[in-house]
């Protein structure tokens, strides 16, 4: 289960750190029925230099974090007064070299009693609104309990200011340095979502980093001389991450024509090492 | 032989000759012969057929784990690793999680020999063919009346037998290309393609999306669809496709420098008010991209 980002003002909820790190602006689009159950929310992220990956654009884990935040928020708004947790995220990034900013749009496709399905599209405003990525996410509907979910409508959250002290994504997400098939993340409180569990975007960033390291470690010398980057990613959030540390264990399934397929299993080591997320990542030499 | 009376005598799954086996309470395997009728441009099995295979193996596991409840596929993702090295291709599925409302299954697809044994090529096991994952929505028994409620006695081994395919699988559906560059293709919702709900089977939906993506992505690159190899399918099943015809459309994403490109394919049930039934992210590359000298 991944993040919900309730969108509270930053000064009221320091747990908005993850979406603020990418300076994600969000605004609600008018619903078809004009009611208070919106089906579409837009977002924009500037792609700051320290967040770019070897592909030249926003690294895929960062893009997935933004999609998880935007799609989760959109899905949550659509089921108020209930809320959601992400259960699966399927994304394809067809262009890795973005100019930026990237503009995203989330549209609720199906809203059922137990689940919400949302589609997401990404265009590169700096490249003439070129379509660079698409994703579909599924969320489970849940009772928010005592959590207060109040938003001024129509919702708008301005783009946060740039940090005077930028840190790279792996450092921000507390991903420990290393190489090989196992990559570890320290679970610090600022990476938790309003439910107190690890933000789904952090899980995606860990999967990206771990799969890229595993692909490089398993490759012959000379593979990806300019680096590697994730493109197609599928993640099933099976259980919430509560304790940490979090470990991504990768299995390289095969490599063909510059593309490596990696199965990623993420474990919450402090919760009896249980499997929390399983997915696959396609890693490209760039 | 059928699984609880499914599929009918004349059915795509029978013509694909799939054979299934429950290997434990939470695992199963399903295989089909890799024939020219289901081959893609690189000589491997089409991604849409692989998706059909894993949908069947996932459904077999889900039916056993959930009994007496039933299920419907909510999403399916398939990533092709490489072409099939053997005469048969086999999906080996295992349960990842069983929740109150959903069930998640993963499947590894491998090549096997005539006896179902793992292949050995140059002294080692070849790379798998594909990895897949699926989410099933749990349908409590009282809601499952249209789905063919399973009996407590589920078979542990069965085979779908038919006359076999004597023409390419897309022609057997049949797929009609209405507007290739727009990814507008169509299939009828006929019993030959039905699932246990009387709607178009999830694997057939994958085949249509694969074909639509290849048409649109090929046209965007000035290529024929038959020159494109689909490597990834990410499918969200939103509603049953029951009336037909089922018509696709595609939006092409940016194309990478190596010709790798993506498209978002939508399927609508034209006979049901043009209802959106499925959204699929499709990734494809030109077949020439698979130069064996490239690592």
List the predicted regions and their residue ranges.
Chain B
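Terminal targeting signals and extreme-terminal segments of soluble enzymes
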Residues: 1-295
């Amino acid at each position: 289960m991944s993040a919900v980002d309730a969108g509270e003002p930053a000064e009221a909820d320091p747990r908005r750190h993850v979406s603020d790190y990418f300076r994600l602006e969000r605004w609600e689009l008018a619903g078809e029925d004009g009611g208070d159950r919106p089906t579409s929310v837009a977002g924009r992220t500037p792609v700051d230099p320290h967040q770019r990956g070897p592909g030249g654009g926003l690294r895929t884990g960062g893009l997935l974090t933004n999609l998880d935040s935007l799609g989760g928020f959109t899905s949550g708004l659509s089921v108020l007064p209930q809320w959601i947790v992400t259960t699966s995220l399927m994304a394809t990034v067809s262009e890795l070299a973005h100019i930026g900013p990237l503009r995203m749009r989330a549209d609720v496709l199906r809203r059922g009693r137990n689940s919400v399905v949302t589609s997401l599209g990404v265009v590169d405003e700096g490249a003439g609104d070129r379509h660079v990525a698409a994703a579909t996410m599924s969320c489970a509907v849940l009772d928010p309990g005592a959590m207060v979910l109040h938003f001024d409508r129509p919702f708008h959250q301005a783009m946060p200011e740039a940090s005077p002290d930028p840190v790279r994504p792996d450092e921000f997400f507390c991903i420990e340095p290393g190489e090989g098939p196992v990559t570890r993340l320290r679970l610090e409180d600022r990476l938790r979502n309003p439910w107190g569990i690890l933000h789904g975007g952090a899980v995606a960033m860990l999967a990206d980093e771990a799969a890229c390291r595993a692909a490089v470690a398993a490759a012959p010398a000379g593979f990806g001389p300019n680096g590697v980057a994730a493109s197609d990613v599928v993640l099933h959030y099976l259980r919430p991450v509560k304790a940490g540390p979090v470990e991504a264990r990768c299995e390289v399934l095969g490599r063909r024509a510059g593309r490596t397929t990696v199965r990623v299993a993420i474990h919450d080591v402090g919760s009896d090492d249980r499997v929390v997320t399983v997915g696959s990542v396609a890693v490209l030499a760039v | 032989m059928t699984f609880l009376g499914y599929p009918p005598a004349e059915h795509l799954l029978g013509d694909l000759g799939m054979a299934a086996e429950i290997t434990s309470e939470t695992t199963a395997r399903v295989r089909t012969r890799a024939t020219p009728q289901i081959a893609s441009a690189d000589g491997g099995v089409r991604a849409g057929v692989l998706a059909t295979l894993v949908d069947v193996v996932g459904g077999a596991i889900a039916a056993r784990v959930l009994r007496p409840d039933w299920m419907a596929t909510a999403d399916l993702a398939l990533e092709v690793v490489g072409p099939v090295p053997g005469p048969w291709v086999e999906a080996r599925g295992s349960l990842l999680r069983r929740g109150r409302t959903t069930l998640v299954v993963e499947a590894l697809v491998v090549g096997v020999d005539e006896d179902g044994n793992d292949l050995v090529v140059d002294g080692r096991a070849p790379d798998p063919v594909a990895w897949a994952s699926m989410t099933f929505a749990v349908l409590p028994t009282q809601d499952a009346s249209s789905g063919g409620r399973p009996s407590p006695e589920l078979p542990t081994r069965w085979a779908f037998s038919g006359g076999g395919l004597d023409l390419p699988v897309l022609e057997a559906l049949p797929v009609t290309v209405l507007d290739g560059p727009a990814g507008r293709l169509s299939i009828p919702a006929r019993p030959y393609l039905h699932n246990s709900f009387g709607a178009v089977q999830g694997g057939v939906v994958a085949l249509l999306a694969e074909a639509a993506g290849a048409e649109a992505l090929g046209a965007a690159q000035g290529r024929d669809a038959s020159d494109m190899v689909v490597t990834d399918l990410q499918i969200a099943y939103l509603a049953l496709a029951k009336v037909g015809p089922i018509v696709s459309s595609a939006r092409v994403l940016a194309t990478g420098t190596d010709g790798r490109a993506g498209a978002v394919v939508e399927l609508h049930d034209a006979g049901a008010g043009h209802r959106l039934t499925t959204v699929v992210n499709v990734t494809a590359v030109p077949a020439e991209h698979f130069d064996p000298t490239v690592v």
